[in-house]
A protein has these predicted regions:
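An N-terminal structural lobe/cap that precedes and organizes the functional/catalytic core
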Residues: 31-60
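Active-site beta->alpha loop and helix N-cap motifs at the rims of alpha/beta catalytic domains
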Residues: 49-51, 56-148, 152-153
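Generic hydrophobic/aromatic pocket-lining and core-packing "Φ" positions
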Residues: 32, 129, 150-153, 174, ...
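Hydrophobic faces of well-ordered beta-strands that scaffold small-molecule active sites
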Residues: 20-26, 41-45, 108-114, 139-143, ...
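N- or domain-start disorder-to-order transition segments that initiate the globular core
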Residues: 1-30, 34
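C-terminal extensions of enzymes
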Residues: 293-361
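Catalytic alpha/beta core domains of metabolic enzymes, predominantly
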Residues: 162-294
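Active-site-proximal loop/turn and secondary-structure-junction residues that shape catalytic pockets
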Residues: 28, 47-49, 86, 114-118, ...
Length: 361
């Protein structure tokens, strides 16, 4: 008689009993090790996260910045900053190599994000994606789901680059990403090129959509039942997942920007990726939330009706025709997120500048 199976944590149980994969929302080495111990098989990063790692480990990275400045006397602070992002990404990617081999490219990848300031320039995005793809065999490149980003996603996919569509909040964006990926894959296949080892995903920043609903709730004196806005991202994710499954798109959805446990618990059972930051992983692992598939449990009609009835931007996010590609860049959560990511790039320039030109006062 065999004993009951034991798991290290709720997240570990999810990875062992359902198709849902765990990635870590950071390239921080200590946090990634914790995640891997609990079943993680990938990691994501963005300019805000990268800046936080560099600040946390400035004792390690300051000498490296000084070395780079000596080695590249003509380099700008921006160029040095991106060198640092590349190096910390490669460092984290090493930890994921076993998962990369085990999953044959579908998992085991480290996401590195293209410069958010390039969000309007498809050619520049692709050029940087090509460079990032060469950093390590198990890279996956984040490209924003902006108008130019959609074109870049098709081009990068055709070139064999696994992409992670980011700055994405809506069903229309996800469909545009999926169709762009399919076009890129078909172009590769028509040329006899391999596609099976590519690990493409499309992120839905579920919590950032919720955040915008809360802003609107305060700005417009809307009255809805308590907690309704916490379901916006989950509702979009579930609907999008159903459509992806019906149409057989060859990419997975990824849940990011965590604000509550439903951004994990309501999506368990999906052939998808959950990518919480370490602080949320520890909260989930300390919880008594039952680990069971809920992806096919619909969001209550009463909740969806309130979101649709009171929030025009939720209607745009929830309907396949809610946004045209020309409207992706001006959608409020897109603008808010790009502004934050671009500000982090500016702060990264400042971090390098403080080493390049220390304040003499």
């Amino acid at each position: 008689m065999t004993g009951a199976v034991t798991y290290k944590s709720p997240l570990h149980q999810m990875t062992q009993t359902t198709p849902t994969c765990l990635w870590n929302d950071s390239a921080d080495i200590d946090e990634l090790r914790y995640a891997i111990e609990n079943g993680a098989v990938g990691a994501t990063c963005n300019p805000v996260i990268a800046l936080g790692i560099l600040k946390k480990e400035i004792g390690i990275w300051k000498p490296r910045i000084q070395d780079l400045l000596r080695e590249q006397p003509g380099a700008t602070e921006d160029q040095i900053g991106w060198e640092l992002i590349g190096e910390l990404s490669v460092r984290a990617a090493k930890l994921l190599e076993p998962a990369f081999a085990e999953h044959r490219g579908r998992n085991g990848r480290l996401s590195v994000q293209t410069d958010p300031r390039l969000y309007r320039d498809a050619g520049a995005i692709v050029e940087q994606a090509v460079a990032f793809d060469k950093l390590a065999p198990n890279m996956i490149v984040k490209i924003p789901a902006t108008k130019a980003g959609i074109a870049a996603i098709e081009d990068a996919t055709h070139r064999g680059i696994s992409i992670n569509a980011t700055v994405c909040f809506t069903l229309p964006q996800c469909i545009a990403v999926a169709e762009a990926v399919e076009r890129g894959l078909r172009r590769r296949e028509s040329e006899g090129k391999e596609v099976r080892s590519m690990g493409t995903v499309c992120t839905i920043m579920v919590g950032r959509l919720d955040d915008w609903m809360k802003v609107l709730l305060d700005k417009r004196d809307i009255s809805v039942d308590p907690g309704v806005t916490e379901w916006a991202g989950v509702a979009v994710f579930k609907k999008t997942y159903g459509i992806f499954r019906e149409r057989g798109y060859r990419l997975r959805l990824l849940s990011a920007a965590f604000r509550n446990h439903m951004h994990w618990s309501e999506l368990i059972g999906a052939d998808a990726v959950i990518s919480p930051p370490s602080v949320w992983q520890k909260r989930f692992n300390a919880s008594d939330i039952e680990v069971r598939p809920r992806i096919d449990d619909p969001v209550e009609a009463k909740i969806v009706d309130q979101l649709l009835g009171h929030f025009p931007d939720f209607r745009r996010a929830y309907s396949e025709e809610g946004l045209t590609i020309d409207e992706f860049d001006s959608f409020a959560p897109t603008v808010r997120t790009l502004r934050q990511f671009i500000a982090a790039c500016t702060d990264l320039d400042g971090l390098v500048r403080d080493v390049m030109l220390p304040d003499p006062s």
